[in-house]
Amino acid sequence: MKRIIFCLCSVFAANISFGQPATDIYLFDLSIKKDKVSISNPINITNHKGYDNQPSFHPEKTIIYYSSTNDDGRTDIRSYDYKSKQTKSITQTTEKEYSPTVTPDGQYLSCIIQRDNGAQDLGKYPIDGGEPIVLIDNLIVGYHVWADNSHLGLFVLGTPNTFHYYLLPMKKDATLGENIGRSLHRIPGESAISFVNKASEKEWVIKKLQTETMQISNLGTTLNGSEDLSWLPDGKIVMSDGTKLFYLQPDKGQNWNAVEIESGANVLKGVSRLAVSANGKKLAVVVTE
């Protein structure tokens, strides 16, 4: 690999680079109230032909990390500071990087490193620049989420795709489920992570893994045919049906409620991945170009 130039849960198959959709990332202002969620003032933060996807917020800074194709068709990690409106390249390598995520200690960006031989390792780059450190290279990792400093939830590619809970220091791996979706998240305010079970063709189920007890419970069903979700700081779940946004309050029933779109409805086309800032004031939305 070449050195990083400056200063992150994602891959469906070993050859994700083929046929990647042309996507952009819009940043909306987000308002969260007890019984109302609204978005407004969208800004295209990528405005770049090709694949710009998998947004992830820094937990404290006004920075979004995302995956973006370069001129050679390979995917690198970039960042956008929505205060200074500056874009930077984080990696420029001979590999492909996906799913950039700030590690719990705030010192690194963990990501999927896709290699030309078909391997998909989980690695991390120093957040201010440096050489990568490989964390997991014995599994074909598609997506990841940090439960804490030493535990991760993993989407592992296979037949079928499986959900793993991985203890990093001991390299201890437990398989907890099959046929899961790509959307893995730590649940705000809880020692828990969420994932989507896609075993049924009729409906997909949002599930919660309590990491202290290792108990798995159901939170609700997804919107029909949708698997990408994100958590709001107050415990609501937000999803899209492709053109509109909805939210669910798992502790108050199974009804999806419409997110009010105060401005920017025209840019919401082919909506897929979503990301919410830690303070709940910004929403990143991936759309088709």
Q: Predicted regions: what is each one?
A:
Residues 1-21:
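Bacterial Sec-dependent N-terminal signal peptides
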Residues 19-289:
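Sequence signature of WD/YWTD-type beta-propeller architectures
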